[in-house]
Amino acid sequence: DPLYTKFVSLVKSDPVIHTLLPLSPKGEICDINGVCVDAAEDEFFRLTTKEGKLTVERDVVRTKTTDYSPILQFEQDPVQILDALLPLYLNSQILRALQESLASELAARMSAMSNAAA
């Protein structure tokens, strides 16, 4: 879970924790051939505060799974699709966090310089 400063406006930035993986808490999803895309019993880790101190909470997601409809067909195996998209997703989310952090830093610098000049 990356922690970054989300750019809201020129005068406001918010600290944000964004979960990258697992993609969703829906558990295991299997196609008609029995090939599973996500794993049941996924673990989520949340960074929280308890009594003024940072702590990590661990949670296991338990959900019921449903199979795809036999009418639904994939041109490629869902696992191959996910394997191809996962690096692109991670790269885009990390790049977005870096860009928002940079925008927040530049806005804070502009604000500090305008306050110093006044």
UniProtKB/Swiss-Prot annotation:
It comes from the Eukaryota. InterPro entries: ATP_synth_F1_ATPase_gsu, ATP_synth_F1_gsu. Keywords: ATP synthesis, CF(1), Chloroplast, Disulfide bond, Hydrogen ion transport, Ion transport, Membrane, Plastid, Thylakoid, Transport. Disulfide bonds join 30-36. One of its GO terms (molecular function) is proton-transporting ATP synthase activity, rotational mechanism. It holds the Pfam family ATP-synt. It is a peripheral membrane protein. Its main location: plastid. It is found in: Plastid, Chloroplast thylakoid membrane. Coiled coil: none annotated. SUPFAM superfamilies: ATP synthase (F1-ATPase), gamma subunit. GO terms for cellular component: chloroplast thylakoid membrane; proton-transporting ATP synthase complex. Belongs to the ATPase gamma chain family. F-type ATPases have 2 components, CF(1) - the catalytic core - and CF(0) - the membrane proton channel. CF(1) has five subunits: alpha(3), beta(3), gamma(1), delta(1), epsilon(1). CF(0) has four main subunits: a, b, b' and c. Produces ATP from ADP in the presence of a proton gradient across the membrane. The gamma chain is believed to be important in regulating ATPase activity and the flow of protons through the CF(0) complex. Inceptin is a proteolytic fragment produced by insect larvae that previously ingested the protein. This peptide mediate plant perception of herbivory through the induction of volatile, phenylpropanoid and protease inhibitor defenses such as ethylene, jasmonic acid and salicylic acid for example. This is ATP synthase subunit gamma, chloroplastic. It comes from Vigna unguiculata (Cowpea).
